[in-house]
């Protein structure tokens, strides 16, 4: 019985340490998962918008406009502000706004993951470099 009570503090300490490590890992990974989710959500929106553009549409249907507005209001304040400033029925304007928002999230994701992004590469491959596009 004495041995069980002696190991309990060590066990509790180990559980606390593991819980703390898991919480710290979650703080690191949750923003990355959220960024990936936001990119995927905007991919879906962009697919729908592109299908309409390819079909020759110029006016954004109400149901898709509602999807874009709902996403923006819940997950992207900057996109929501831009949607309010543009003609929300203009398919091309909404497509461009969502595309720009997705690019911004990609930059945020690169920063979270601590990897280079296309802006970093543009600075690295300055005009005059043999590898510059």
Predicted regions located by residue number:
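Charged, low-complexity interaction regions
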Residues: 23-36, 54-61, 80-95, 118
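N-terminal non-cleavable signal-anchor helices
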Residues: 9, 16, 33, 69-70, ...
